[in-house]
Amino acid sequence: MGNSCQNGTYGNNYQNSNRFQNDRFASRYVDGNDTEDCYSGSSRASLAGALRQGLNLKSPVLGYKTPNVRELYTLGRELGQGQFGKTYLCTEISTGCQYACKTILKSNLRCVSDIEDVRREIQIMHHLSGQKNIVTIKDTYEDEQAVHIVMELCAGGELFSKIQKRGHYSERKAAELIKIIVGIIETCHSHGVMHRDLKPENFLLLDADDEFSVKAIDFGLSVFFRPGQVFREVVGSPYYIAPEVLEKRYGPEADIWTAGVILYVLLTGVPPFWADTQSGIYEKVLDGRIDFKSNRWPRISDSAKDLIKKMLCPYPSERLKAHEVLKHPWICDNGVATNRALDPSVLPRLKQFSAMNRLKKLSLQIIAERLSEEEIVGLREMFKAMDTKNRSVVTFGELKGLKRYSSVFKDTEINDLMEAADDTTSTINWEEFIAAAVSLNKIEREKHLMAAFTYFDKDGSGFITVDKLQKACMERNMEDTFLEEMILEVDQNNDGQIDYAEFVTMMQSNNFGLGWQTVESSLNVALREAPQVY
């Protein structure tokens, strides 16, 4: 188990913190025109029967009896929280070794596909267990309330956090890191697994002092695949999604595209495809043009550009395979990647990209949690009216039914709501609907904004400071990295803190994506302040 016996803290990574909706969806694949699942018809029938009989309280998810997890482990503090449950630090009673325990509440498994997703995630983790640079599952347990997945504890935090704390950053270091990431992809693909949600925050370190102790986590969207199999479900994170995924016809080549995006971010600090809205990002991805000329691409070698072009080839059949990437001259051992420091603007950009909108997202969560039943009863009725199949989720076709409530929402607000909710899954559940609607609902907006601001400004000074953000992150078990960047992104008068007017401007701005102007202005401030380098 390597370093699993050591103490450590990390954010919500184990619990899919950045997959606001994706946890619920995965794992349908299509061969030709025939849709299949990972489970037999009889298995699906038994699951459906279990749901009808009250799965949430009594029925088994794993399909076999397990010991009581609390007889073997002591569950400690919360490490993260996600849609289906929470992740805790746990200590094995017999050895004293520490692990991470992902607890998935059965009450949150509302349909057959939810149960299948949990089973498949566990199957894939067992299938890949013991492979280098992939988080190791120790065991699974089930009781009447929850399923518990015990895995090794990645105590070193996020890989990208470590990168951004370095004072010197070079192409050679980027090549070493992307070699690890593509090596993980090669391992997955050779074992018949497609990850489908690779992104920087899904790579953690076992040991903060060892940059090569990288572990890939979060297989909640991963699937088994066969050669030639075609997948049609749109999943993933907007900046990293491959064009063929958006076109609903893809295979494992999509993971290579994602790695190419990560490499671009490593070298420049910004993603290759971005816009002010998610739909705008998707348009850029489908267009496929890569910027190698602007000042966002300073002093990068031709060999690195060549590799990125081949990893971000818009045609999957012509895109490099994982083993071909590892043989590229820029990335292989003793390759041509230079050890010369990258342009000094890269690390501030990388930090800014990692921290973008984190304060806004946290603030929206705080507002949503504090809404009274009276404030959300109208939205609840809207959701129920759209949820015609009583599945506790609605599709985007159903979401368009909001137009019948035009007295509350304008057409432009409905479009914004759809973009805010859309993480490429094409569905949204109740909690997600509320959190997305919070930023658009004009009713008593001032009251909600003041409540969120006050959550941070507990001493009533009228300002949000780095220290206050740190305390808020501790309260919510979030990583407190790059707090200065969170301030910097919102601080308009450069006084190092956020006043209420600046906070309101941030919250009311329609910046679901990361626009270049936002980064450019923030970057200029960052360079003036010359900070030392998630």
From Swiss-Prot:
A lipid is attached at G2 (N-myristoyl glycine). ATP binds at L79, G80, Q81, G82, Q83, F84, G85, K86, T87, K102. Keywords: ATP-binding, Calcium, Kinase, Lipoprotein, Membrane, Metal-binding, Myristate, Nucleotide-binding, Phosphoprotein, Repeat, Serine/threonine-protein kinase, Transferase. The active site is at D197. It holds the Pfam family Pkinase. SMART domains: EFh, S_TKc. It is found in: Membrane. Residues 374-408, 409-443, 444-479, 480-513 form the EF-hand domain. GO terms for molecular function: ATP binding; calcium ion binding; calcium-dependent protein serine/threonine kinase activity; calcium/calmodulin-dependent protein kinase activity; calmodulin binding; protein serine kinase activity. The keyword Metal-binding applies. It comes from the Eukaryota. Its main location: membrane. Residues 337-367 are annotated as: Autoinhibitory domain. May play a role in signal transduction pathways that involve calcium as a second messenger. Involved in the activation of sucrose synthase 2 (SUS2) in developing seeds. This is Calcium-dependent protein kinase 23. It comes from Oryza sativa subsp. japonica (Rice).
